[in-house]
């Protein structure tokens, strides 16, 4: 008989945070909303809070950046480590160190699905439909995949079965699709700036923005709108039709996550050929099944928020069974290793984190070292050919470990 590789057990899990309300502001990293002043990501973007004038101008004014970055590191008995980052900050550290640790330590590094199910089952009574708890579980799951890849010496995408294409092509999310086109991206997705409280004037302003970018970018470059849960069905439907003359490719996350009937109605009434998309703030596999049943065109889970890579693979299968695309909310290497193995992900998202969208800054900068960025709008699979997720933790980021066990 051939010898089978003996895998080590997990010795310890540790959790740090940086940024957020209890640390330095503008830290970036896993909480990419935690940016400094004069950044497009915080400039009068429509949100569910925009109807309150005190919180209309800035998303940071209502606390979008209070959580900060969570870093989870798992160490095997042989000394090898894996890690991941997400948005959960100091509270995520508590959950990892005081609750989830019992399901991780002592397990084999390959026991990812067992650990995942135990974490989900043990937090049902306080996790609700996602949010902070699911962000934390996602971060642990990603760290486990990173460790497993490093122990066996393979990139995560090969652990998932290998690439189905040679490269990933990207669209860019940011305020300047015209600059994204110059950088080689296939499309540009802009945030909306107005909402139902602004009435028809808001629709005219956002439609004018799309018209202006269509003129700058030409006929064939993709243009999309990200509405960040800020609308109702009637407003979203009117906005979609107002943008139809400018060949808007899709309208994204118009409604809050649980308004499934609203998404069904929006898809039914949207202009022919315009796609309806959503999913980044859905936090359970069950919610994605229900979202899929509404008939939307693209589901957009965030691998750092939906339950991790283990859940993302399951979501992709649900979408594939219905002929839907799954295009994850931008998550850098954590998405790259997944989508290059999905047959129903023909393109992916790159989130522009440079303040004016004029330069290529890694999404989770500065917390990850060696984080790849698209070149001419693409990343070749060979760039991902490093053990685990292929990135290292920047330990100069003033990481704090508030709890231990």
From Swiss-Prot:
Mg(2+) binds at residues 226, 252, 280. Reaction proceeds via a syn dehydration. It comes from Escherichia coli O9:H4 (strain HS). Substrate binds at residues 33, 59, 349. HAMAP family: Rhamnon_dehydrat. The active site is at 329 (proton acceptor). It is an enzyme of class 4 (lyase). The keyword Magnesium applies. The record marks 349 as: Transition state stabilizer. This is L-rhamnonate dehydratase. Binds 1 Mg(2+) ion per subunit. Its cofactor is Mg(2+). PROSITE patterns: MR_MLE_1. NCBIfam families: PRK15440.1. GO terms for molecular function: L-rhamnonate dehydratase activity; magnesium ion binding. The record marks 302 as: Increases basicity of active site His. Homooctamer; tetramer of dimers. Keywords: Lyase, Magnesium, Metal-binding. It catalyses: L-rhamnonate = 2-dehydro-3-deoxy-L-rhamnonate + H2O.
